[in-house]
Each structure stands twice: as C-alpha cells, then as structure tokens.
Design a protein with these regions (language model features):
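Pyridoxal 5′-phosphate
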Residues: 1-408
Length: 408
C-alpha cells in the first residue's frame, strides 16, 4: 500500500484552499502535479548545468550532455526498450504520434488501411486522417461493446489490407484498458505495424514494450509527474532506421554540403535543434520518483480508489457513467454526466466545493458522438488522491444535485 499522506507532502500545490475549500485535484488525465524532487531537478539544471548538449567541450556542456543522455537511459529502463537508440525525446504524445503517421505516409498506398478505434484521442485520429488523405489509404474504425473495445469487430476488420494499427492503451474518457498484447499479436499476424498511445497508461502501470512486442509507443511527461513539453517516442530500431527525419536543422546532421546533407545515427537523427534538456532531466527524475513508489503499487492504489468510488457514484440518482462496468478493465478515469446539467456547469459547481474535474469533449469528439452526448465531466485519479477525495467528489455531486433539483 502507498503511504499517500507522505506522497502528498511531496506535492506542495495540493496544500491550498480553493473557494474556501481544501483542493481536491481530480484532473490527472489532463495533467498531473509535480513533486518537489522534479521541480528541484529542473532548477538545479538551470542553476548549475545550463548549456547546450552534444556541442561543447566545456564543463557545463559535458555535464548537461551526460545528464541528458542519462535521462534517455532512465526512460529506456522504465519501458524496457532494447536500446537507447529506440528512445526519442519529443514534445509529447501528440508529436510522437504525428511522427509515426508521417512515417506511414512513406509506406501507405491506395487500397491500404489504417485501423484505429472510436475511443481515440484526437492526437491519434487526425494524424492518421492526414496520412490517409495524402496516400489514398482508408481509415477504418473499431467500435465498442458494453463500453469497451469490441474485439469481434477488431478481428473482423484486421485483414491483410491493414498496414498500421494505432490504439490507445487506456482511454482518456472511458477509462478502459485495452488488451494491447493480444491486439499486437493479431496485428502482427497480418503484417501490420502496431502503434500504441500510452499517454494514459504509462503513468499508471508497468510498461514493457518488449513483452508487449510494440512497434511504436508514445507517451508524455506531464501526465506522469514530469514537466510539460517533453515526451517520448519508442520505436523498434528496424523501423526507426527506415523512418525519415521529420524535422531538420542543427544537432541531427552528420555533415552538410551545399546541395545535400547526411544524418546522425539513432536516436539523434530525429532530435533537430536544441532539445528540451531540462524537460528530459525532469522526466527522468519523475520516473525515478515513480519507480521508488513502484508501478505495481501505483496501479493497485488507483484500482482501490476506483473500486471504492465507483459504486458510490452509481448510487447517485441521475448520474450516468460512461465505459465498461467491469472495474478490472478500468484505469483511474471516470467520465459522467448528471441529468441534463451541462458538464461545464457541473464542473463549475464542483469547483465551488474545491473539486477540480475536467469538462468538455476531452479531445475525443468521435467517441462522444458515438455515445450520443455532446460532452461530459471527468474525474481522474493519481498517486496523491485518497478515499477522502473520493468522498468529497461524491458529496459535492450530491450538493450539486440538490442545488439544481427539479431543473433536470
């Protein structure tokens, strides 16, 4: 079990009053808060080692380069990549998925298909729309059954026409965790390249890209107690060798002639310009922090919170929860609506009680269209949340229901 009270002391932002109430932060699927150790690591870099990497031979540059590449090795171990050549630093999951879709444009042709699901974040939809538009390939969707991915639908649509399968490991709306290992095996049987959006799984569970046999895996630092503006793209070396750089300029070149240029070896051929050194160091520090807690313990804690709060939410008359009712399939995300109350009004009412949740379409408009709802509220949990936070959410929802009684 986690010592949550000790963990909370590492996050000073949580110790504040919002609208005369103690803050209950339940918007972790959007971004997580940062522990002091991460803030100190970033400050330490700027205070002591601020210099460009891979370029200078002076002491600060050497220290900065060593820290930056040590961060890459930390990430490699965290996801069990086979080599640091397979770990690329990006601006975040969105950038990572765009890079893979750009690679797909080099492979796809008319008559080919890309298979995604209706539960995807826009960042795992729009890049594929563009890739298909440019190449004449077809974008095919897998739909839902009982609030989870319809595996029968997936099997039926996973033919040899499919060249790429790109799915969320965990939905940022439904909270459902997809059986990625099984899906990857099915994708590889038809020769498809498997791409996984790990933005909502990497912060919450142990990831082993080799065990899952993923071809590409993307995630962001800010959703796992790390800084904003830093993310990771893991790719199997054989595909990264085939993949053309997406950005060009300093740092990624081997040699430049008047009419041509050659690239550095992996992973640096993809990292043009001055990288986010402080972000990489901050992310590696966040990884170290999470690993000291233990990713199995992180997952177990969130499962305990969901098991505690889910039936309490179900008991609220007029509250609709989206996604599978099988809690074994769920992560720490719960999307809901309360009667006909607009989710923005609901979120505002909860904020009056000090409870921070998300409201809107959660960058998943095709999913909400499929569910036939314009928007929803969403509560999402992390390592510093408690059962008391769950109780406060339920109590705030009951107060909101009573306040708006008779209006929905």
């Amino acid at each position: 079990m986690l010592d949550v009270e000790a963990i909370r002391k590492d996050f000073p932002i949580l110790d504040q009053i919002v609208n005369d109430e103690p803050l209950v932060y339940l918007d972790n699927a959007a971004t997580t808060q940062k522990p002091l150790v991460v803030l100190k690591a970033i400050n330490s870099y700027y205070e002591q080692d601020n210099a460009n990497v891979h370029r200078g031979v002076h002491t600060l540059a050497e220290r900065a380069t060593a820290s930056y590449e040590a961060a890459r090795e930390t990430i490699r171990k965290f996801i069990n990549a086979g080599s640091t050549k397979e770990v690329l630093f990006t601006r975040g999951t969105t950038t990572s998925l765009n890079w893979v879709a750009r690679f797909a444009e080099e492979i796809l042709a008319e008559g080919d298909q890309v298979l995604i699901s209706v539960m995807e974040h826009h960042s795992n939809i729009i890049p594929w729309q563009e890739a298909c538009r440019k190449t004449g390939a077809e974008l095919v969707y897998v739909y839902l059954k009982d609030g989870a991915l319809d595996m029968e639908d997936l099997r039926a649509k996973l033919t040899d026409k499919v060249k790429f399968v790109s799915l969320a490991h965990a939905s940022n709306v439904l909270g459902v965790v997809n059986p990625i290992k099984e899906i990857t095996q099915l994708a590889h049987q038809v020769g498809a390249i498997m791409v996984v959006d790990g933005a909502q799984s990497t912060p919450h569970m142990k990831i082993d890209v080799q065990d899952l046999d993923l071809d590409f895996f993307a995630f962001s630092g800010h959703k796992m107690a790390g800084p904003t503006g830093i993310g990771v793209l893991y790719g199997k070396e054989k595909y990264l060798e085939q993949m053309s750089p997406v950005e060009f300029g300093g740092e990624m070149i081997d040699f430049v002639y008047e009419q041509s240029a050659s690239w550095k070896e992996l992973p640096w051929k993809f990292e043009a310009g001055t990288p986010n050194m402080a972000g990489a160091i901050g992310l590696a520090t966040a990884v170290d922090y999470l690993e000291k807690i233990g990713m199995d313990a992180v997952e177990a804690h969130e499962q305990e919170l969901i098991a505690y709060v889910y039936p309490k939410l179900q008991a609220i008359e007029g509250l609709t929860i989206y996604g599978s009712q099988d809690l074994a399939q769920r992560s720490g995300v719960i999307a809901f609506n309360l009667g006909d109350l607009h989710p923005h009004d609901l979120a505002t009412a909860l904020d009056y009680e000090g409870v921070a949740v998300r409201a809107g379409h959660h960058c998943a408009q095709p999913l909400l269209q499929y569910l036939e709802v314009p928007a929803s509220a969403r509560a999402s949990f992390y390592i510093y949340n408690t059962k008391a936070d769950c109780d406060k959410l339920v109590d705030a929802l009951q107060k909101t229901k009573e306040f708006f009684n008779g209006t929905f």
